């Protein structure tokens, strides 16, 4: 009986050692081995031909913005981050003498040099007329993505696409684009025969196609505006009425969100909306983790203030 008790105590001590050792091991040893991939989304909107920073004149925006500081930050992030997409939500043109003189050529060239992956069109991108925008696309090394403008029989025919799928490591990222209704906002002669179609219907149809093509994440570049006090279609309405869009990169209303807004879509899942002001004063950064089951987690959201303020 004494021997059995001694053996019991000895075996109990061994078991206790195993339990203690197990508690000291990293938790991830017992975690699922499900693969997690990461993607970083950098984005701008409503840059409005602001190639240089605001003048150092003591005003509120003095020294802010400019492509030099944006390009430097983008280069730094790409050097530190493996998978990056750089996107713009429209209104590239109009707002400084650069557009008045050169009609958008330096803006498009600058975006190409910075390595933008895609953009959509804003209403001010029609300000030089459709033929002008078409001519400037000669300098673009990135696609213009729009799914709710029918540009058949216009100078832009064949020069926009409804979506594009980007392969980033193990991930397939689908990007679509929607634009605002032009009638009453843009002079008729500047958008010509462009036919505006319901952006919610077009976005849902395009997103479903991207989902069926196996995209792990679906992003909408939108120039609808974040929200309105009437029933005008906005990013907020699109987020609530969509089925498969994970992220809406917005523009038009020049809002600087302190953090992405979260909405529940038609499938009961999260759709995020973000926007980063105007004039290229900010660069948005969103870092996502995506599991093999296509579950998205926003790890980090930040808007970088670009340029240096003149302090007097």
Regions found by a protein language model. Give the residues of each.
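Hard-cation-handling environments
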Residues: 312
């Amino acid at each position: 009986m004494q021997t059995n008790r001694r053996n019991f105590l000895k075996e109990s001590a061994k078991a206790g050692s195993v339990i203690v050792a197990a508690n000291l091991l990293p938790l991830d040893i017992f975690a699922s081995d499900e693969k997690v991939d990461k993607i970083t989304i950098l984005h701008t909107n409503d840059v409005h031909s602001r190639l240089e920073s605001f003048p150092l004149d003591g005003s509120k925006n003095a020294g802010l913005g400019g492509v030099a500081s944006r390009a430097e930050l983008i280069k730094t992030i790409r050097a530190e981050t493996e998978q990056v997409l750089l996107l713009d939500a429209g209104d590239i043109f109009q707002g400084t003498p650069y557009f008045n003189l050169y009609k958008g050529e330096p803006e498009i060239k600058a975006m190409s040099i910075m390595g933008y992956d895609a953009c959509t069109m804003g209403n001010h991108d029609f300000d030089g007329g459709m033929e002008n925008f078409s001519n400037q696309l000669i300098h673009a090394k990135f696609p213009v993505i729009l799914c709710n403008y029918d540009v058949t029989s216009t100078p832009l025919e064949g020069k926009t696409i409804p979506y594009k799928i980007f392969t980033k490591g193990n991930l397939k990222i689908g990007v679509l684009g929607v634009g605002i209704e032009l009638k009453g906002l843009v002079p008729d002669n500047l958008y010509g025969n462009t036919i505006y179609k319901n952006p919610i219907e077009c976005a849902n149809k395009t997103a479903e196609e991207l989902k069926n093509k196996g995209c792990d994440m679906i992003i909408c570049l939108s120039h609808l505006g974040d929200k309105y006090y009437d029933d005008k279609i906005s990013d907020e309405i699109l987020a609530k009425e969509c089925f498969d869009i994970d992220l809406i990169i917005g523009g038009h209303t020049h809002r600087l969100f302190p953090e992405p807004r979260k909405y529940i879509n038609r499938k009961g899942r999260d759709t995020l909306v973000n926007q980063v002001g105007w004039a290229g004063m900010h660069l948005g950064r969103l870092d996502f983790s995506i599991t093999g089951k296509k579950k998205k987690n926003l790890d980090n959201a930040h808007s970088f203030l670009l340029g240096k303020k003149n302090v007097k």
